């Protein structure tokens, strides 16, 4: 903000910062190899991709909307309305229209509790290689494709989570520097 909202100056600040230049590797790999030859301790953790369900759950957690309740009946989360209202053929007839759970506490539970309906896939989760409900899946495919980035930029679910995240930050903090610090902590999981 001090530099007149210049993106070029922001990029320079980020790319020349000590934090950006740090490595995710352990500073003394030899001693770590002696103490933990099988790599079972928490001293080392190689970065990995999040799977579709983890991405949705992380967005709900950051926005403050995640219901952490464990167990219970399956929930019906929000999905793209164009897909929800699409007629589906089941056993020679037409299935009823998909309706998400009416209360946010119900539909914002972890994705592992989401009801899976054959013939109806959530486009957001599908973009990130969630296996279909039609067949068993021994190993997930991992891909990096343009629709993933476009989904994170344009999906209605992502925009709703971003608005809820902004509302959470404004509710918790008073000034701009506190908001930015808290946003950084929450978005990177350091809270």
What are these model-predicted stretches?
Residues 1, 8, 21-187, 191:
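An acidic, gly/pro-interrupted, aromatic-rich
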């Amino acid at each position: 903000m001090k530099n007149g909202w210049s993106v070029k100056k922001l990029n320079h600040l980020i790319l020349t910062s000590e934090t950006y230049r740090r490595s995710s590797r352990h500073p003394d790999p030899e001693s770590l190899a002696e103490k933990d030859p099988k790599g079972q301790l928490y001293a080392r953790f190689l970065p990995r991709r999040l799977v579709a369900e983890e991405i949705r759950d992380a967005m709900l957690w950051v926005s403050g909307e995640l219901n952490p309740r464990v167990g219970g009946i399956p929930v019906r989360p929000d999905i793209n309305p164009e897909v929800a209202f699409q007629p589906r053929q089941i056993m020679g007839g037409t299935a009823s229209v998909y309706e998400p759970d009416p209360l946010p506490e119900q539909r914002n539970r972890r994705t592992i509790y989401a009801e899976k309906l054959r013939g109806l896939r959530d486009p957001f989760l599908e973009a990130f290689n969630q296996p279909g409900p039609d067949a068993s899946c021994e190993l997930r495919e991992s891909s990096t494709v343009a629709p993933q980035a476009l989904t994170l930029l344009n999906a209605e679910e992502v925009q709703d989570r971003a608005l809820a995240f902004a509302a959470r930050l404004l509710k918790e903090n008073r000034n701009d520097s506190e908001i930015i610090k808290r946003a950084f902590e929450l978005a990177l999981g350091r809270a």
